[in-house]
Amino acid sequence: MLKSIEKLLNCWDDLKVGNHSSKRIHSVFYYMYFGTIICEADYEREEFKLPYNGAYSHSASTRRAVNDYKRYFLGKGFTLTEEAAV
């Protein structure tokens, strides 16, 4: 897992680490890469979405970031409710 993503996942406040950032609104966290939401996690419902389908879709770094979030939340027992093709 990327160190920057690991820092975001271990923080309960808004944070920016390099090109990665997070925004918290109530129990929902929005994880962004270059300002675009690539993962949305609801800690209350234990669900997450991977709604990303944007300009960086062919980038290996974007695919890696999306896969890191997916692996992390599935490992925590969260349910994947939406996944866009990357």
Name what the model sees in each region:
Residues 1-86:
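Terminal leader/tail segments of proteins
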